[in-house]
């Protein structure tokens, strides 16, 4: 297997698909903005950062530390691979190391892949701290004995809104009283995912969580992060019914990105009808070229069936690629999913073909090439998916391949609609009566409702 540079892939694209390239956009590299360590940062944490090659913080990390330290609800908006995990890890652990009575922290992630990835990242950081708390992941894959251990002794727990709704809040008095009574921080990553009907339900789950925390004597600080949202301040205000400090001046450096917009050619059938070839006419040879030349690649498809079809087409007649080109989709067993994630991070897998299951901020290594088989549906998802590559500071390439649909055909011929358009706003309405009223019985089961309550005021449901 030869070693190929990302510049060679660009030459391959421009040579083999020259007549099909509708546009090329170049996002030039940007330098970062840095700040020194906070004066009150624990020396042990300073040593850990230095040991990991971190001599300074990005400006947004410094701001986040300052605001969280002042007990302010904080929203951090920055692009992928900008150190968001470190932004909340530092202030939380800085307080944890100095605290005489250990507190608990709840970390919420929208997908299992992201939860397991952050469990690994957070766990690695925690192992370097002498006064290390107990970390656990509470989701549908967690065995019964592990769940009991988490309930008894966890200081840091990773979970998701579904488990919060169905597993934690209904049992807050019997199983979670210890954890909730000392809950100090709630971290919500990828907060832009909580929008629409789903976000409205999640907002009411947070209403119930704050109510239960108040019953147990805790008043946690919310820390949120997002890479792509058009109305960050308004969104978190609607989601949590709290005022937030919004930090949106991203101080991380940006590597150079080349984005190609390709429209597969029109061909004539035997009946002389014109039709456009599918995205596979471009993605199959491109994936094969990348895999054979050691270019680490991710290809996004809209549906599971498309993932499987594309994978079969790539390895058809090229069975030597079967071990380094793999499909990733929903419906896999937990063991299969984690095995794929490990092999992807280690570099054993060179190309992963996936649905949007890997769209969010899971650290999947130093990828160089991103292929989008059709428009993902929103401008936010376009940038989220293309942001999977170039995370380690290296140049990267994104290839958008249009399908023969009205939306894709419009976008491939009007690329400024994507590259210059603002990110969509995330909207929700937690007071929608059809949603709000579904949470009233849940809240009443968790603790008797009273007319003077602020979270579930009687006026809202009369």
Where are the regions that the model predicts?
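Helicase-associated low-complexity/disordered flanking segments
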Residues: 1-62, 72-73, 133
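Conserved strand-helix element at the start of the C-terminal RecA-like helicase core
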Residues: 104-118, 287-315
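Conserved helix-turn-beta segment of the N-terminal RecA-like "Helicase ATP-binding" lobe
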Residues: 114-139, 238-244
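Conserved helix/coil segment N-terminal to the catalytic DExD/H
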Residues: 140-182
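Conserved helicase ATPase core of P-loop NTP-dependent helicases/translocases
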Residues: 146, 332-355
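Post-DEXD/H (motif II) to motif III coupling segment of the RecA-like Helicase ATP-binding lobe
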Residues: 175, 185, 192-252
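Conserved interdomain linker/interface between the two RecA-like ATPase lobes of SF2 helicase motors
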Residues: 233-304, 428
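Conserved segment of the helicase C-terminal RecA-like domain
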Residues: 380-429
